[in-house]
Amino acid sequence: MSNQPAHKIKIGLITATIWNNDGSYSVDMSRSYKNDQNEWKNTSGFFHSDLLNVAKCADRAEIWISRQLATRT
């Protein structure tokens, strides 16, 4: 994997980070939150109320990756 993501998709507090490793794509999903010290942090755990945005991010990530792969052929 490169040090920089190929693309990021953000919906609300949910982020899909897309990585390109020699043409093979992977996706990390995370939720942003503020801790007790009011600092922004990320977690891979999601609440029930996050799941719709997780699904939307996953869908948009799949579309973005599919378009990238289609331009190679």
Segments (PLM) and residue ranges:
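Single-stranded nucleic acid-binding surfaces, predominantly the OB-fold ssDNA-binding core
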Residues: 1-73
